Structure formats: structure tokens, C-alpha cells
Curated annotation (Swiss-Prot):
Belongs to the ATP-dependent AMP-binding enzyme family. This is Putative fatty-acid--CoA ligase fadD11. Gene3D superfamilies: N-terminal domain of ligase-like. Was identified as a high-confidence drug target. The gene is fadD11. Residues 1-35, 67-91 are annotated as: Disordered. GO terms for cellular component: peptidoglycan-based cell wall; plasma membrane. InterPro entries: AMP-binding_CS (IPR020845), AMP-dep_synth/lig_dom (IPR000873), ANL_N_sf (IPR042099). Residues 78-91 have a biased composition (Basic residues). It holds the Pfam family AMP-binding_C_3. It comes from Mycobacterium tuberculosis (strain ATCC 25618 / H37Rv). Its EC number is 6.2.1.-.
Amino acid sequence: MARLRGAGAAGRCRPGRFGSSARRHGLADDGEPDRVLPARRRCSARRRHLVFGVQHPARRAADLRVRQRGDQGGHLRATVRRSRSRQRCAHRTHRLRRWRAPGTLSLTDLYAAASGDFFDFESTWRAVQPEDIVTLIYTSGTTGNPKGVEMTHANLLFEGYAIDEVLGIRFGDRVTSFLPSAHIADRMTGLYLQEMFGTQVTAVADARTIAAALPDVRPTVWGAVPRVWEKLKAGIEFTVARETDEMKRQALAWAMSVAGKRANALLAGESMSDQLVAEWAKADELVLSKLRERLGFGELRWALSGAAPIPKETLAFFAGIGIPIAEIWGMSELSCVATASHPRDGRLGTVGKLLPGLQGKIAEDGEYLVRGPLVMKGYRKEPAKTAEAIDSDGWLHTGDVFDIDSDGYLRVVDRKKELIINAAGKNMSPANIENTILAACPMVGVMMAIGDGRTYNTALLVFDADSLGPYAAQRGLDASPAALAADPEVIARIAAGVAEGNAKLSRVEQIKRFRILPTLWEPGGDEITLTMKLKRRRIAAKYSAEIEELYASELRPQVYEPAAVPSTQPA
């Protein structure tokens, strides 16, 4: 810590350098645990910092640097380190290392310049004011260039205590840090809540290994994006199906059938019968509790899902095995989480209630507006965009369309700018369509529904990378996306899954045609963000030719229709 204090001073972050001339530090996040200490020192020493992911090309990092320049000579100093543990990111990090604009320091440079006597830490932290900007979080850029969200100490403190009031956080609670630190969700759970409540954080450098890490961590509170929950679900189902011990296999099959009954009752909005309650208690004692231990969730008190919609079927599945998950909603502009309910109080299909201390209302066009202590200070150096987002009465226009029930539970319809309005003027939620189809197609990892201004809906489907290897190995097939996208059995299975999903949608929402892309979409790439949000405009532009073929008068090669009568297990 002392070394970092001196390092910060070497970066000219001395007391008195606040306001527009305050020094701003940038941290290039490679997912390694030692990124936390520099960020923590900047939180307590009245320095602003931002974190950007190593997936950003050098020109994006340079653009952020230019946009961060202060009017009175402030500078962004980027600290960049190269990851040796994640070879997939190594070349991208190397590109950032070659980008050494004037005034840029590496952590090595910063440590070398450190002086223990140069910095008065005590007086500096005492000078921190609630409305001082502590960090900048850049939006994902799904609808345009990323914007720097200015968050204050007051924002983050209110967020932490509001989460505690609703969910309950204890000293020593075990959590994981595995999502990108450029995202506020991981920063809140892995850094800010740890500082406020003394949680125990285990950093997992590669998010793809999170399932393997959970049994060692044994988290007591845990949250993830929907795709992680869906992968855990697929892993459980795979384990049950591949159990070689006959007695264990039968016990697992019985317990999972009981869990399925509980899930079905939840989906139907029905109470469990006394018989089912007793049967589930027995299944839990003999099998399900041991399954949770095996997953690492034996001591889990509550679990969350956020950042994107999650299928109700996934939530019901986990509730069935004794892991109730609360779906939450928030955004960087609201300092992370803005709605939540404890899993014991949650309602399936909703994102809970507005956190205590916030005000909310639904505008005439359905957009949800929020006012209160979690609203950001503004977008960095973009007063016009700030004025568009926060009106003169202090209401933040979230861009999300909501419904609310009589008890105050909120349901996200979709992003206001992403609603599908077909040729007949019918409004539809693409997220609802996508979640419904994805729940019936476990081999598909990502899909984008298309239909704005069209007479019917179509979809682009992309494989789940983790499903390809096992599926191909079991059948002796080439595991490449291109080969599987052309395999007749795979096409038939996915067509059956689309038909199954369509059966749960209204006629106008149903997918009439689809194509399976012979590629994978990587988080942080052209098509999806690190938290698996679709970059719809970029996808529409990149795959414009493929999309037009979906609407051709005659069925084109590699364009398919849902199976009229599902004749095989959906993929």
C-alpha cells in the first residue's frame, strides 16, 4: 500500500489537485487480481480513474485518452500490463503496450518513481468530499460511441448500503470477481462492497473457468450474467445425463424430476401441493443439497442475475434445485443496481422493486425514469448528452421500457431504441423473442431477432462455443462452426427448437426464417459486448446481405424454416 501511495504521488496526484485539473488514471484491465490495488488507492486518494478492457484496440484507448483531457491541463495516465495467463488477449494487450503517448506510464514506471515521503495520504483522504468524482465507467457502446459516466463517492456509498438493505451483506461474505472490471457490476462486487463491508473476494482471471472455481470459493453471495447461469444449467444437465453409476444416475434423475415439478409450478404461478413439498424436501435431503455442494453453492444465501434478460425457464430450473435467483436491473448511469428484491420475495419475470431512496415513474411512451442519489453526475465532457439523459427536474431517462404491477414489481419490456415495430405497426420486444427461442435451443449461444419495418420476423443464430466440442465428439463430427452449421442433424435439431420456442410466442412474434452463422461471436468483439449485450446496429450492418436473403421471395440456401412438427430433440 505504501508503495502505491508513493507511486500515486509520482503520478502527480498530490493534495489540492482536484476539480478540472485533477489527475486521471487509466487502468487497462487484463482480468488479473493485482489490478485492484491501484484502483483502491485512487478511490481513497481523491483521484479519478477509469478502467478499459484489453479488448479495446489501441485507437479506442487513444480516443478515450483524448476525450479525457481536462480543460486546465489534466491528463489521463494509462497503466498497462501484459497478461501472461490469457494468451487469447496477449496480442491485443501488446498493441496497447506499443501505444505510449506522451504522459503515459506503466505500473513498472510508476513503482520505480515512487517515494514514500512524497505523499501525505492521511490529509488527502480526509479531504475527499461526497460529490467528488471517484471513477469513470464507459458505457458499452451498443447504440453509439461509449460515454464516460462520472460516478461520485456519494453514488457508490448509497449503492452499497441500498444493496445491503435489500439483500443483506455480511462481513466475510465470499464473492468472486470474474467479470470485466471495465463493467460497474464487477467493480461494485469485487472492490467497492469489499471496502464497505469486508467481503472476501476471490479473483478468477478467466471467466471461462468460473464453474471450476466455485467449489473452491464456496460463495455465500453470488451474481452472474444470464449466459453464465445458462452454461451452469447446461453443465448440470450434462452431468446428470452422463452419470455412469446406475444407482447415482437413477437418484439424480428422480431428484431432477422432482425439481422439474417445482420449476413447472413456479412457471405456472401455482403453489406447490403438500405432496410435492414433502417430495421435494426428501429429494433435497438425499440428492439436491449434495448437488449444490458439488457446484460450490452449498452455503449460498442469495444469487443474482443481471446485465441482460434471462429466460424464465432458467430461473425456474435453478429454483427447482434449491438455488433461487433474483433478477436485477441497473445501468452505469445509475451506479450499477437500481432494482432488486431478495430471492425469497422475488416474482418470476420481474426485476424486483426500485431500491429504497429512489423515485421512479413511467413516461407516456413507456420509458422508465429514475430520480435519486444513484443518478450519475453526468457524462464526462459531454454536457449535451448529459442534458438529454437527465432532465431539468433530475429525472434520468433510462431508455428502457417498463411495466409495473400493483405491488411495485417492475418488468423490463426492452430497450426503447431496440423495440421491433413491424410493417403493420405492431410493437414487439426482441429480447423476449430471443430469450424464448434460446431457452429451447441449448446449442445456440446468441441470436438476434430481426423484423423492424418487415412483414415477419427472422433471426440470426450463433452457436454456443462450449457446446460444440462435446456435441461433435459424441457424434464423430467436425467441431468447427462452419461444419456444424451445414450438418443436417444439427439444422433439424435447431429447427425443432425454434418451433418449440415459437409455440410460446404470439403469431406476430414468431420466427418465420432463420440462418445459422458459420462463426462464433466473441464477447468484446464486433457483435456482442463483454456482458453479452447485442450490438444490434453493427450486426445489422455487418450481416446486411445475410439478412436480406432471409426476406427473399424464395427460400435461399442456408436459410431455414422452423420444423412444422418437432420430430427430434431441440439443439
